[in-house]
């Protein structure tokens, strides 16, 4: 019995010594923790703990890097979204809608008026009379004559003679055979030409204005 009691005491002392040794071992963890890692030798493996800590540090670093990349991508996206706002600043202040509409309406009205005037002139030339202004040197007024009512240069001369108090007849009766007055006209190009140089049809299509000038100026 005595030997059995001594064996139990020895076993308890050995167990207590082993427990004290385990408590005195250095571990990675907060104080008071009782985390034990068993290996094939039955003790704690500090190298494994260091490897575990390094792995956790690497994961933390990757996590932070990923967060930074996401933040940078978000900032870049925000910059791209804000870029059109800067482009809209160009051309400030903007033209208001009613001003644009007014401008377009005025332009359309001017185009319609011009088109209507051209059509009216074309219809007048085709179906109605072909009136041109007539001026005479020394006369304070202008007259108009319808070229379509004349069949040639002779009838045109007679019509002008009636408009300006028979100036051509008076000149002929005075014995001035060379003529005191001459008839000229202004063509499409604005050039002044003498009446009778071109065929009658060409004359009435290009005549814009008639002028009765002195014969001395026509020479």
UniProtKB/Swiss-Prot annotation:
Induction: By auxin. GO terms for biological process: auxin-activated signaling pathway; regulation of DNA-templated transcription; response to auxin. Keywords: Auxin signaling pathway, Nucleus, Repressor, Transcription, Transcription regulation. Its main location: nucleus. InterPro entries: AUX/IAA_dom, AUX_IAA, PB1-like. It is found in: Nucleus. The keyword Nucleus applies. The keyword Lipid metabolism does not apply. GO terms for cellular component: nucleus. A motif (EAR-like (transcriptional repression)) lies at residues 24-28. Residues 60-71 have a biased composition (Polar residues). Residues 129-215 form the PB1 domain. Highly expressed in flowers. Expressed in seedlings. Residues 24-88, 109-128 are annotated as: Disordered. It holds the Pfam family AUX_IAA. It comes from the Eukaryota. PROSITE patterns: PB1. SUPFAM superfamilies: CAD & PB1 domains. Aux/IAA proteins are short-lived transcriptional factors that function as repressors of early auxin response genes at low auxin concentrations. Belongs to the Aux/IAA family. Homodimers and heterodimers. PANTHER family: AUXIN-RESPONSIVE PROTEIN IAA17, AUXIN-RESPONSIVE PROTEIN IAA24. This is Auxin-responsive protein IAA24. It comes from Oryza sativa subsp. japonica (Rice).
């Amino acid at each position: 019995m005595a030997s059995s009691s001594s064996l139990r005491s020895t076993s308890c002392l050995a167990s207590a010594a082993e427990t004290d040794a385990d408590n005195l071992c250095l571990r990675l963890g907060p104080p008071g923790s009782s985390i034990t890692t068993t290996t094939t030798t039955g003790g704690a493996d500090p190298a494994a703990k260091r490897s575990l800590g390094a792995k956790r540090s690497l994961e933390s670093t990757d996590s932070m890097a990923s967060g930074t990349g996401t933040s940078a991508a978000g900032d870049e996206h925000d910059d791209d979204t804000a870029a059109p706002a800067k482009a809209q600043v160009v051309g400030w202040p903007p033209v208001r809608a009613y001003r644009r509409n007014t401008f377009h309406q005025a332009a359309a009205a001017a185009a319609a008026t011009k088109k209507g005037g051209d059509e009216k002139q074309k219809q007048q030339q085709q179906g109605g009379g072909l009136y041109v202004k007539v001026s005479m040197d020394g006369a304070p007024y202008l007259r108009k004559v319808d070229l379509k009512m004349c069949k040639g240069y002779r009838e045109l001369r007679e019509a002008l003679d009636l408009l300006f108090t028979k100036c051509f007849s008076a000149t002929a009766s005075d014995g001035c055979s060379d003529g005191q007055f001459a008839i000229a006209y202004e063509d499409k190009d604005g050039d002044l030409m003498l009446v009778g140089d071109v065929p009658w049809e060409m004359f009435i299509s290009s005549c814009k204005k008639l002028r009765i000038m002195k014969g001395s100026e026509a020479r």
